[in-house]
């Protein structure tokens, strides 16, 4: 576990002829395991191995995509009501994933703007709000949404267009004042992030341990962003991303906590864990564990009972 860089480079090179099976997600799982093993062997949490910078970080409530369920996220008012519920829980920021296919009539720029407006009206001016469009829109549609969000004082617009078309993101970033966040799903690990920064394709960068191949490349991206004065927001919850956030010198502003929905109790840990990876206090801060490795309190009994092989 102490040769993580060597192993990551080897896997990255092997990926060139095996991309269909040796995906970034597979490499990410291996890299996470190596960091966890190293921390456990040295009796240190991973964020301390990475350098250590903070012990807590503010979280944003990240919703599930909208639905057609009674009592779910089925209307602008439903999103507004849920935002108020999240604010009562302690969240200082709220990110919207709007409705998308196969729901009839979606994706819809006008519906997205209506949802965003309803949420802003409900929570007032002080709660940070964001929108994730999940790459559904054209340049014109993304521009329309972005201009509306500027008037609503949203913190960022995330992944509104297909990320394979970097030129469209350069155009959008140049023509809007709201910060554009990306790339999230574009292939290319740290190399794609470097090119987006060079070309000015977004204002804020984006990566996650399961998107780019683990903690090792995420920290490379963090240092790349630091050198260029660009904030890095990490994608998705989880112990790996949380450990990285606690070690980033120029931090991402938030930890993504979710995905949240009116029907779900996020405060209940997954059955393979005894406690949450990301406990949040009443002020909206997520605290990192000082347990060795990734800091997870694993329910080994559950894992043994549900193992499918050896």
Kindly give the residue locations of the regions a language model identified:
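Shared catalytic-loop signature of beta/alpha-barrel
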Residues: 6, 17, 153, 164-285
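Glycine- and other small-residue-rich loops at beta-strand/loop junctions that grip anionic moieties
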Residues: 27, 105-108, 131-135, 158-161, ...
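Conserved, mostly hydrophobic/aromatic
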Residues: 30, 43, 94, 132, ...
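Extended hydrophobic packing segments that form well-structured cores
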Residues: 290-310
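Glycine-rich, aromatic-flanked loop segments that form ligand/cofactor-binding clefts
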Residues: 31-66, 70
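Metal-dependent enolase-superfamily TIM-barrel catalytic cores that perform enediolate-based chemistry
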Residues: 56-57, 61-170, 175-176
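Metal- or metallocofactor-binding catalytic centers and their adjacent structured scaffolds
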Residues: 1-42
């Amino acid at each position: 576990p102490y040769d993580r860089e060597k192993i990551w480079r080897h896997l990255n090179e092997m990926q060139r002829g095996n991309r269909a099976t040796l995906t970034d997600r597979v490499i990410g799982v291996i890299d996470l395991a190596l960091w966890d093993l190293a921390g456990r062997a040295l009796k240190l949490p991973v964020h301390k191995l990475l350098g250590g910078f903070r012990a807590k970080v503010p979280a944003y409530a990240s919703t599930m995509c909208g639905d057609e369920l009674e009592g779910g996220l089925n209307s602008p008012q439903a999103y507004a009501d849920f935002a108020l519920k999240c604010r009562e829980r302690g969240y200082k920021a709220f990110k919207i994933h709007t409705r998308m296919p196969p729901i009839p009539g979606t994706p819809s720029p006008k519906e997205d703007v209506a949802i965003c407006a309803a949420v802003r009206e409900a929570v007032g001016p002080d709660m940070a709000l964001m929108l994730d469009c999940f790459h559904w829109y054209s340049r014109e549609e993304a521009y329309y949404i972005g201009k509306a969000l500027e008037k609503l004082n949203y913190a960022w617009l995330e992944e509104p267009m297909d990320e394979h078309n970097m030129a469209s993101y350069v155009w959008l970033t140049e023509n809007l004042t709201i910060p554009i966040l990306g790339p999230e799903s574009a292939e290319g690990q740290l190399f794609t992030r470097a090119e987006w920064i060079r070309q000015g394709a977004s204002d804020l960068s984006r990566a996650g341990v399961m998107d780019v191949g683990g903690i090792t490349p995420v920290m490379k991206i963090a240092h790349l962003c630091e050198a260029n004065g660009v904030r890095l927001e990490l994608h998705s919850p989880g112990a790996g991303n949380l450990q990285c956030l606690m070690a980033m010198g120029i931090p991402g502003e938030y930890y993504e906590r979710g995905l949240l929905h009116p029907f779900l109790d996020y405060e209940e840990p997954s059955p393979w864990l005894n406690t949450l990876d990301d406990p949040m206090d009443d002020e909206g801060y997520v605290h990192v564990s000082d347990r060795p490795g990734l800091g997870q309190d694993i329910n080994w009994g559950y894992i043994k009972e549900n193992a499918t092989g050896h």
